Amino acid sequence: MTGPTCLAVVAGISGVFVFGALFSVAQIYNDISSFADNAHRELGEFKGFANDAWNSMVNHDDATRVARSVFVRRHKKHSQCNCGPQASNCPAGPPGPPGAPGDRGLDGQPGGAGNPGQPGVAGPKSHEQQECIKCPAGSPGPAGAPGAPGPQGPNGQPGHPGQGGSQGPAGPRGPAGDAGAPGQVGAPGNPGQAGRGGQRSHGLPGPSGAPGPQGPSGAPGQPGQSGGQGQQGPAGPAGPDGQPGQPGQDGQAGAPGNDGAPGADAAYCPCPSRSGSSSAVETGAAEQGYRHRAVAARHRNVIRRRVAKKRVVKKKRVVARQA
């Protein structure tokens, strides 16, 4: 294999690898863009679930306030309190979420009239004519750039005719002329005298003559019998591995997971025990709030599991393509 052929082969292989690298980069960029779009969409869904949970919690707080107001009114009617011991030295609970934005305020009243301004100052009665200030002349500026060439001038007057020159020296000898035409054929000569009788002898055979020209091609022969079918050759070696195939489509979303176990109680003070119908009202409101919180927590867990699963699938695809 010659040098140019080797160079062409190496250049072709390098071009194939470069094209494959560019294709891989484009695929990775496409996967990253798809992953970012999916993440934004899932974050939007999660935000919607969070807003729904927050609205349900706000509604629960309103219901709790109503229940508390009913309990307070009933508590004022009783002469005696059967409540348990009140808790003391309780740590402050975590700050609640920000409230909903309030309504826009009313426009302000128009302002009053401003105070009168200061009296103006009288100007001069007459203007004096002043002479202009004469400044000394400055130094001359630098030379300007050369101007454009002017137009072409008119043609000059024709000159006087020149005088005749003297005879020049003899030139060099020229080359020999061409050969002349061949002369005419001379007249035939007179016949010569008869020769004497020579001795006869047999000479040696002369050398072989040159081979003659090749004869014409003969007529085509009869077609021969067809040969039998040859035996099948051995199997060739296995070819190189092909390019990795296109990634498969995303599988269907899995079924939502089972409900999580209820969490442990937070670090809040224990509520005092109550008796009567007021405890039943607050117990029902507390159970309703717990259901809302459990539903919101279940939605958050489902979304987190989906996001984590999709991230693992994306990472596996990127690793498979790089390999």
Curated annotation (Swiss-Prot):
Keyword Glycoprotein: no
Biased segments, Polar residues type: 80-89
One MF annotation (Gene Ontology) recorded for this entry: structural constituent of cuticle
Signal peptide limits: 1-28
Composition skew (Gly residues), residue ranges: 108-117, 159-168, 224-233
Domain of life: Eukaryota
Cellular compartments per GO CC: collagen trimer
Region described as Disordered: spans on this chain: 80-293
Coiled-coil stretches: none
Family matches, as Pfam families: Col_cuticle_N, Collagen
Chain intervals for the UniProt region annotation (Triple-helical region): 93-125, 138-200, 203-265
Keyword field: Collagen, Cuticle, Disulfide bond, Repeat, Signal
Ranges of Low complexity composition bias in the record: 136-146, 169-191, 234-267
Role according to the record: Nematode cuticles are composed largely of collagen-like proteins. The cuticle functions both as an exoskeleton and as a barrier to protect the worm from its environment.
Family: Belongs to the cuticular collagen family.
Subunit structure as annotated in this protein's UniProt entry: Collagen polypeptide chains are complexed within the cuticle by disulfide bonds and other types of covalent cross-links.
Protein's name in the database: Cuticle collagen 39
Organism field: Caenorhabditis elegans
Encoding gene, per UniProt annotation: col-39
